[in-house]
Amino acid sequence: MELCGLGLPRPPMLLALLLATLLAAMLALLTQVALVVQVAEAARAPSVSAKPGPALWPLPLLVKMTPNLLHLAPENFYISHSPNSTAGPSCTLLEEAFRRYHGYIFGFYKWHHEPAEFQAKTQVQQLLVSITLQSECDAFPNISSDESYTLLVKEPVAVLKANRVWGALRGLETFSQLVYQDSYGTFTINESTIIDSPRFSHRGILIDTSRHYLPVKIILKTLDAMAFNKFNVLHWHIVDDQSFPYQSITFPELSNKGSYSLSHVYTPNDVRMVIEYARLRGIRVLPEFDTPGHTLSWGKGQKDLLTPCYSRQNKLDSFGPINPTLNTTYSFLTTFFKEISEVFPDQFIHLGGDEVEFKCWESNPKIQDFMRQKGFGTDFKKLESFYIQKVLDIIATINKGSIVWQEVFDDKAKLAPGTIVEVWKDSAYPEELSRVTASGFPVILSAPWYLDLISYGQDWRKYYKVEPLDFGGTQKQKQLFIGGEACLWGEYVDATNLTPRLWPRASAVGERLWSSKDVRDMDDAYDRLTRHRCRMVERGIAAQPLYAGYCNHENM
């Protein structure tokens, strides 16, 4: 019987209606799930605005901050030398720092003409800087430079005291971070007392200028950001297999033939500029010339330096590491490193020594003969150690110290006392730290801080959570741990992405190496780092965001 006139849906129409209803329910459920995920993520890392107030990074050793607010007027505030300071107007390093930090404090904001009721507020009119010992104004920073300082902020004069200029530079950065604008646009600072010094003496950033050439202006920008985060070592991995951009005075063919192009080189003037720019910010420039591996670009401009590699048919088919059997190798290296010691004033040279591939040496009959003559048998680690020992002796004769990657220690090279070992292999690095320090060698750590290994999300947290001294050993061993480095290797990094890939991720490493072991509060770190990141952006550093949020300066 046909039901006419009732308007009931036919079976196909009913099925379509049911499917539509089911689809709508599923979409609603998925929306709810997505909302729950978003809420959970927001709860884990809340969206933080750039709220007013100081955000110190890295956190000083001791901070006593009162609620008493003082004000600064850009046109009526000066940074100058204390009358009893051992440094004075002739100290170019401090004079330039005074101008620089006045600009950091006031120059990146729209100056605000304050309403009349705010003109009479208590003001800080001057920051007096006092160096109490020999200033070292014209010196270069070194591994034992004193970076301690005290800062007393009160009206009408704030006082910054440091034993050396290096501590004054760190204190100026802290003072600049204390200043903020209130809701009226007034430059404000809390009455404060700060006593500060770094936990570790070596706090480095590694840049790689071989895989990709980095223009000098990018290196200088990196040095600025390092100063904002109180890093004090630029580890300059300047050459590698891919290119040789260092323009040697003695061996110009190294860069003429080994660089990507003649415009992709660092001239002597470029190198001097980087070193002086770093010095004015209290930063050492540590050059790395990695041998005997990672040297293919060297061979293009230096004949007979590299080892010929042979196929199974005894045919020459490529070149490998530096040839460790020839006297000419060591004559070249002696002359080359003498030049490096004169160009780079730092007391250390990083000699590399990592990832040496033995297959080429194994294929070369002359290398095999040399091994037999020396009694090395077939243990190519002994040949590697033979080479490393020769290079270490060269460095010692030019009165420089050596830093090496951990393989040099692992492969039983005879290291001179005081040789610094850099631990970079992420697997079981605490055990490696224990072994190196048990043998009496100073150590620096980079294994957990390879910033080229990127991941989506807030990976700064894992860098921040590392406790460098969390390895087995005596107190004497722990004292041999002198610091660490955040490394940004250059296979996938050039001038377009170096800065946002470094910052603020490297900032997490900076606080871990400067601040007390007890500074561990992740929520507080997130709040401070979010605002510190905004401050870096205001100062011209293209630091990537930590999470959802905003910076106050974005609408200025």
From Swiss-Prot:
The active site is at residue 355. N-linked glycans at Asn-142 and Asn-190 consist of Man(3)-GlcNAc(2) and Man(5 to 7)-GlcNAc(2), respectively. The beta-A and beta-B chains are produced by proteolytic processing of the precursor beta chain. It is found in: Lysosome; Cytoplasmic vesicle, Secretory vesicle, Cortical granule. This is Beta-hexosaminidase subunit beta. It comes from the Eukaryota. The record marks 497 as: Not glycosylated. Disulfide bonds join 91-137, 309-360, 534-551. It is linked to GM2-gangliosidosis 2: An autosomal recessive lysosomal storage disease marked by the accumulation of GM2 gangliosides in the neuronal cells. Clinically indistinguishable from GM2-gangliosidosis type 1, presenting startle reactions, early blindness, progressive motor and mental deterioration, macrocephaly and cherry-red spots on the macula. Residues 43-121 form a propeptide. Gene3D superfamilies: Chitobiase/beta-hexosaminidase domain 2-like, Glycosidases. Its main location: other. InterPro entries: Beta_hexosaminidase_sua/sub, Glyco_hydro_20_cat, Glycoside_hydrolase_SF, Hex-like_dom2, HEX_eukaryotic_N. Changing residue 491 to Q: No effect on substrate affinity and on catalytic efficiency. GO terms for cellular component: acrosomal vesicle; azurophil granule; azurophil granule lumen; beta-N-acetylhexosaminidase complex; cortical granule; extracellular exosome; extracellular region; lysosomal lumen. Its EC number is 3.2.1.52. It comes from Homo sapiens (Human). The gene is HEXB. Addition of GM2A stimulates the hydrolysis of sulfated glycosphingolipid SM2 and the ganglioside GM2. There are 3 forms of beta-hexosaminidase: hexosaminidase A is a heterodimer composed of one subunit alpha and one subunit beta (chain A and B); hexosaminidase B is a homodimer of two beta subunits (two chains A and B); hexosaminidase S is a homodimer of two alpha subunits. The composition of the dimer (isozyme A versus isozyme S) has a significant effect on the substrate specificity of the alpha subunit active site. Belongs to the glycosyl hydrolase 20 family. Residues 1-42 form the signal peptide. It catalyses: Hydrolysis of terminal non-reducing N-acetyl-D-hexosamine residues in N-acetyl-beta-D-hexosaminides; N-acetyl-beta-D-galactosaminyl-(1->4)-beta-D-3-sulfogalactosyl-(1->4)-beta-D-glucosyl-(1<->1')-ceramide + H2O = a beta-D-3-sulfogalactosyl-(1->4)-beta-D-glucosyl-(1<->1')-ceramide + N-acetyl-beta-D-galactosamine; a ganglioside GM2 (d18:1(4E)) + H2O = a ganglioside GM3 (d18:1(4E)) + N-acetyl-beta-D-galactosamine; a ganglioside GM2 + H2O = a ganglioside GM3 + N-acetyl-beta-D-galactosamine. Hydrolyzes the non-reducing end N-acetyl-D-hexosamine and/or sulfated N-acetyl-D-hexosamine of glycoconjugates, such as the oligosaccharide moieties from proteins and neutral glycolipids, or from certain mucopolysaccharides. The isozyme B does not hydrolyze each of these substrates, however hydrolyzes efficiently neutral oligosaccharide. Only the isozyme A is responsible for the degradation of GM2 gangliosides in the presence of GM2A. During fertilization is responsible, at least in part, for the zona block to polyspermy.
